[in-house]
């Protein structure tokens, strides 16, 4: 059975400042670097064979730190990018106008084809994330890949594997450097295809982004 591990990037400067990142970028904080190092220790123990990451800077840096710990090369896949938040990227959440907050709410509340102007819908993100995940089926037998991606993108992926709409991602708590696992099973008795084994595990972190619950 193929096991694929899903990791959200470490905490970034804009996470800490409550800015909208999307496909724009900000560097990892000191805490984010430490979180990635703790994932690296876990990845080494798990026997990770491949590290595949979004090509955005914060995920690349997280993947590089993990790769140093488990001796893997880093492969870039732009399908693992975060949801494109269009014209709201780089904005502080507290500065959104009523109209702009309405766009954001339409997106996260599942309004059909809801999106920020010049951005993506959650269904579009889900489709490309599934493409990246399904590519793991072509890896050599015995592979144990780890994908480094983003909070909303991973939430859309996990939600739709569970048979829920992509916007159900808001019901998942995938903190910075949390680890989720999905398995590909083929069974005459159980549902064939991808199944969710764990979601949002932070047991490997000494400070699992508790501040996210307080902001």
Swiss-Prot record:
Which positions, given as ranges, span the membrane? none
Report the catalytic activity.
(2R)-2-phosphoglycerate = (2R)-3-phosphoglycerate
- Keywords attached to this entry: Glycolysis, Isomerase
Q: What is its EC number?
A: 5.4.2.-
* SMART domains named among the record's database cross-references: PGAM (SM00855)
- Presence of keyword Isomerase: yes
Site described as Transition state stabilizer, located at 150
- What are the record's GO terms for cellular component? cytoplasm
Looking at the keywords, is Isomerase present?
yes
User: Annotated pathway, please?
Assistant: Carbohydrate degradation; glycolysis; pyruvate from D-glyceraldehyde 3-phosphate: step 3/5
Q: Which top EC class is given? A: isomerase
Give the GO terms filed under biological process for this record. Answer: glycolytic process
Q: Which Pfam families does the protein's record reference?
A: His_Phos_1
Q: Which InterPro entries match?
A: His_Pase_superF_clade-1, His_PPase_superfam, PG/BPGM_mutase_AS, PGM_Phosphatase, Phosphoglycerate_mutase_GpmB
Active site as annotated: 9, 82
Q: Which family does it belong to?
A: Belongs to the phosphoglycerate mutase family. GpmB subfamily.
Q: What NCBIfam families does the record tag this protein with?
A: PRK03482.1
Q: Which PANTHER family match?
A: BROAD-SPECIFICITY PHOSPHATASE YOR283W-RELATED (PTHR48100), HISTIDINE PHOSPHATASE FAMILY PROTEIN-RELATED (PTHR48100:SF1)
Name of this chain's protein:
Probable phosphoglycerate mutase GpmB
Upper lineage is: Bacteria, Pseudomonadati, Pseudomonadota, Gammaproteobacteria, Enterobacterales
Per the record, the gene is gpmB
